[in-house]
Regions:
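Conserved class I S-adenosyl-L-methionine
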Residues: 72-83
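Conserved alpha-helix/loop element of class I SAM-dependent methyltransferases that forms part
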Residues: 54-72
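Alpha-helical subdomain
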Residues: 201-397
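Bacterial N-terminal signal peptides that target proteins for export
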Residues: 1-14
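Class I S-adenosyl-L-methionine-dependent methyltransferase module
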Residues: 98-256, 365, 371, 375-388
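Conserved SAM-binding loop of SAM-dependent methyltransferases across substrates and taxa
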Residues: 84-92
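Boundary at the C-terminal end of the N-terminal hydrophobic targeting segment
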Residues: 26-28
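Bacterial N-terminal signal peptides
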Residues: 11-23
């Protein structure tokens, strides 16, 4: 079963206790600072009609080759939603990641993920904690295993409710020590979220409240195994190195969940001020398809203003997604059904990259901008043209 520490001999116990005493105050200071940053950057939350435990974007990894071409890495990453952010973080390797969402539930989910990352020695232990499975006897043997083998282990290993309850209790003890205020209602929500992963396993999908589920939403399994446009796996669990990139940031309190509205009056501006103080430019801002909702409710101009408050890197980008061909919005009205750029066959969603300079140029007069115009101007080509083959010169034999 997953454990949070290894057995120690009695001879080593006094030494270990001494180390813990020395480490305790330092950890407490870090935790206090983590909670302080969460509070400083947050604003009152709002409502959205979904749990968003997992992403609904089948195309979320399609931007990875273009991110590599742009040579984006380091700086600060800002993103919305649940764990698809971890895959972007694994690719970009930022110094800090700030995860903003209008739903306080998203902050709670990320606190649970943080606890799991901090105690997990590898991907196998992380997934066993998430899905309530007993961990294999020798965890270290799984560190170099293909992700497919790890998922097969989860498939053939039944969940254990006693292990799930024990793990959740220990994880909640750690969540409490982060210093972010957690009330009884939050604890109920966290247990419900964790139990959803336990009950549905790798087949868990995005769910909405009050509207029918859209066919074709990806399962968590398919999101883990997704590939980029070049056919390469790219999720944060695809390799142990990518997992460790995220885990190490989590252990250093550098993945900060924040409650806030992208078009709100406080959180985005507070994030901008905090990153300016730290001297960290934003290399990537992931907004999912939130802009569509902002156009619908007339708050996109405030979002554009908030983006201007961020210290964007000169080659930094917005990462966005959009869904469907005929359900796009132009200030509240549907746009035509013609295919848009970056749509890939068989995909429920499409991803886009847009550089900060292009976005800022396009949104100089946001009140007169349509969602369709936003999606069709100044976007980065995701598919790089193939390099021409070098022709080999034929050697002509000289007559003897």
């Amino acid at each position: 079963m997953p454990t949070f520490g290894s057995a120690v001999s009695r001879k080593l116990l006094p030494v270990l206790l001494g180390v813990l005493v020395l480490a305790g105050p330092a950890r407490a200071r870090q935790t206090t600072e983590f909670a302080h940053v969460v509070a400083r950057l947050s604003e009152p939350g709002g409502y959205f009609d979904s749990d968003n435990l997992v992403s609904n974007e089948t195309s979320y990894l399609h931007v990875l080759p273009a991110l590599r071409t742009l040579d984006l890495h380091g700086g600060a990453y800002v993103g919305v939603g649940p764990e698809q952010n971890f895959s972007y973080i694994a690719e970009l390797k930022p110094a800090i990641a700030i995860l903003i969402d209008i739903r306080r539930d998203n902050l709670l989910l990320h606190l649970l993920f943080k606890a799991m990352f901090e105690v997990s020695r590898n991907r196998m232990e992380f997934l066993c904690l998430l899905y309530g499975r007993p961990a294999p006897p020798v965890l270290a043997r799984w560190s170099d295993s293909p992700l497919e083998d790890i998922l097969t282990y989860l498939d053939i290993t039944p969940g254990d409710s006693a292990i799930q309850s024990r793990n959740h209790s220990e994880l909640m003890d750690r969540v409490t020590r982060f210093g972010v205020p957690i009330n009884d209602s939050d604890r109920v929500t966290l247990r419900r979220f964790h139990d959803e992963f336990y009950a549905q396993g790798l087949e868990i999908t995005f769910t909405s409240r009050g509207r029918p589920s859209r066919p074709g939403y990806p399962t968590e399994r398919s999101l883990y195994l997704a590939t980029d446009l070049e056919g390469h796996p790219g999720s944060y669990l695809s390799t142990e190195d990518r997992f460790r990139t995220v885990r190490d940031l989590q252990r250093r309190d550098k993945v900060v969940p924040v409650v806030g509205d992208l078009s709100g009056p406080t959180a985005m501006k507070a994030i901008g001020a905090y990153l300016k103080e730290a001297g960290l430019p934003v290399t990537a801002l992931y907004v999912s398809n939130v802009e569509m909702y902002l156009f619908r409710q007339g708050s996109f101009p405030r979002f554009a203003e908030n983006v201007r408050a961020l210290p964007g890197a000169p080659n930094g980008v917005l990462i966005r997604s959009y869904f469907g061909r005929g359900m796009l919005w132009n200030g509240g009205g549907p746009v035509g059904a013609s295919p848009l750029p970056q749509v890939q066959p068989g995909q429920l969603s499409a991803q886009q990259l847009q550089t900060f300079p292009a976005f800022l140029q396009l949104t100089q007069h946001p009140d007169s901008l349509s969602y369709f115009e936003l999606l069709t101007n100044g976007v980065v080509e995701l598919r790089q043209p193939p390099r021409p083959r070098r022709q080999r010169r034929r050697r002509v034999r000289q007559p003897a």
